[in-house]
């Protein structure tokens, strides 16, 4: 990938000047009654992306596209898809796209096609899923599996948990449980719910050394052996999503039940790999394949659609406009679908771990904003929690509103009520409510304006708050796969333009190193003085209270 400082491009300078036009969303709609027609894109007639309620015009988009071209987006995209080692700090290719490459077109890393190995792992996953789901796989007392616990953290947990929740309508009879936190409460509460005779534990750790994951896995192992008192039972109740065959075997897991993935799969992009085994077990392998197919379709769109019609690129560019030029520091993901209740948390990791960097590809600190803070909750819950600040606060918070046109649960008029809020919120954020409108409402209600003059300012909404509306025909494995891939590619595009490396996560390491240094200090009652006064004080109080 090229090393291009975006702030030194002609497009960046032009965008800085263009910002002075102070585009206003209500005014843009007033000037063009058909604005929606020009500012939305459609993916396979299943996902509609409306970006008309942003403070942009054609000039904005032209300059943003020029910025993408000047920053080498096209060549960077081909570099990723073709297996070049674009993760320079770890000298790795970035090929989550190969995991869902349903066309089987060869993808080369160091001259070797990775697709045969990808397909071999998928075939192994399919066979394993069929045995567990059908009941032919038996536990140590000869009973079929009823419960599956996925033990992982970060990408080994967030993605599988998000997808299994999002696609709950497609679930089979297996009960799924996810354990991530090293807090013993998490594993303890899950183990209370399950029977060791009928439980399968998936241990998701590439190295099989991840501290949190292995602590939980060893606790689950002790729990099983407390019930059965036979080490051979471990092989009937544990499987590994890992590449460390030696440690897997040492744990007691049959390496025939070890599902591999590769160093070109980043953790936060790994749900498409063997890390997605919990998804396949929960939904059935055919639905896991449909998830892959949806992502592959979006990959093809991203790779081949011209920039004017390219959905992930358009969303990425508008995000850069909002954050780097209009001053937004956060982005809210607001799914109007309860099944998507972990979607924002998933892309909180996806975006913030990818683009939360302050060093450019040239090794120097950047002078521009990089990745935004990403957060969100399902609608309509958020409306009764934090929308107040979005509507009337002093922070600019661009929002993505996501909703399905068809619900899996057509209960009364619930879905119409839900979607009426979905449509109303973006309209309210864009157009607000003027002082004149507030006064007219008071008059219509029979109030004397003199009596309510003090209240009027508090009921004014300034509007001009940017939103994207993403309307999905129905949340299915295919459309969810496409939606996830859409956001993945958005993150990639922004990383290219920010001139950072999006596929490492060195920020995770320092805390781990310090925790490993502190852990032995907690094993005794001695007072600690080896840290700063704050850390010493906290550790010593912990020792006094435990």
Curated annotation (Swiss-Prot):
Major subcellular site: cytoplasm
Swiss-Prot/TrEMBL catalytic activity: alpha-D-glucose 6-phosphate = beta-D-fructose 6-phosphate
Enzyme Commission number, as recorded: 5.3.1.9
GO MF term set: carbohydrate derivative binding; glucose-6-phosphate isomerase activity; monosaccharide binding
Domain of life of the source: Bacteria
A Pfam family hit: PGI
PANTHER family (UniProt xref): GLUCOSE-6-PHOSPHATE ISOMERASE
Annotated protein name in UniProt: Glucose-6-phosphate isomerase
């Amino acid at each position: 990938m090229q090393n291009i400082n975006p702030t030194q491009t002609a497009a960046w300078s032009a965008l800085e000047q263009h910002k002075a036009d102070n585009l206003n969303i209500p005014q843009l709609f007033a000037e063009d009654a058909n604005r929606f027609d020009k500012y939305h894109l459609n993916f396979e007639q299943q996902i509609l992306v409306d970006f008309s309620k942003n403070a942009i015009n054609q000039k904005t988009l032209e300059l943003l596209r020029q910025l993408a071209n000047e920053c080498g987006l096209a060549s960077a995209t081909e570099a990723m898809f073709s297996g070049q080692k674009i993760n320079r700090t770890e000298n790795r290719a970035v090929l989550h796209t190969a995991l869902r490459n349903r066309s089987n077109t060869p993808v080369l890393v160091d001259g070797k096609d990775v697709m045969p190995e990808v397909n071999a792992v998928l075939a192994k996953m399919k066979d394993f899923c069929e045995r567990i789901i059908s009941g032919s796989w038996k536990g140590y007392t000869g009973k079929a599996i009823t419960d599956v616990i996925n033990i992982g953290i970060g990408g080994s947990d967030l993605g599988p948990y998000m997808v299994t929740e999002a696609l709950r309508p497609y679930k089979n009879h297996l009960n799924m449980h996810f354990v991530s936190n090293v807090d013993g409460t998490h594993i303890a509460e899950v183990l209370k719910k399950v029977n060791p005779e009928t439980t399968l534990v998936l241990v998701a750790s590439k190295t099989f050394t991840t501290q949190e994951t292995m602590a939980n896995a060893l606790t689950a192992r002790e729990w099983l052996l407390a019930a059965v008192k036979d080490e051979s039972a471990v092989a009937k109740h544990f499987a590994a999503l890992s590449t460390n065959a030696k440690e897997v075997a040492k744990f007691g897991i049959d390496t025939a039940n070890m599902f591999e993935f590769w160093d070109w799969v980043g953790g936060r992009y790994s749900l498409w790999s063997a890390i997605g085994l919990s998804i396949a077990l929960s939904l059935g392998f055919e639905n896991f394949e449909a998830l892959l197919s949806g992502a592959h379709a979006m990959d093809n769109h991203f790779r081949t659609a011209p920039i004017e019609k390219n959905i992930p690129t358009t969303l990425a560019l508008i995000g850069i406009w909002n954050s780097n030029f209009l001053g937004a520091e956060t982005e809210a993901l607001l799914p109007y679908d309860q099944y998507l209740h972990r979607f924002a948390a998933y892309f909180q990791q996806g975006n913030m771990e990818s683009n939360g960097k302050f060093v450019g590809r040239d090794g120097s600190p950047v002078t521009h904003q990089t990745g935004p803070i990403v957060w969100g909750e399902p609608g309509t819950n958020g409306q009764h929690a934090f929308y107040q600040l979005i509507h009337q606060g002093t922070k600019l918070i661009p929002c993505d509103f996501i909703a399905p046109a068809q619900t899996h649960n057509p209960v009364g008029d619930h879905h119409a009520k839900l979607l009426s809020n979905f449509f109303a919120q973006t309209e309210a954020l864009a157009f607000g409510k003027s002082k004149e409108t507030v006064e007219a409402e008071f008059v219509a209600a029979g109030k004397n304006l003199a009596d309510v003059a003090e209240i009027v300012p508090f009921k004014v909404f300034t509007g001009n708050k940017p939103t994207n509306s993403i309307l999905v025909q129905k949340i299915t494995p295919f459309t969810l796969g496409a939606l996830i891939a859409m956001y993945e590619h958005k993150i990639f595009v922004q990383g290219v333009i920010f001139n950072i490396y999006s596929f490492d996560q060195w920020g995770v390491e320092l805390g781990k190193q310090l925790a490993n240094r502190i852990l032995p200090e907690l094993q005794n009652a001695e007072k600690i003085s080896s840290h700063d006064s704050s850390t010493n004080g906290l550790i010593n109080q912990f020792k006094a209270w435990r």
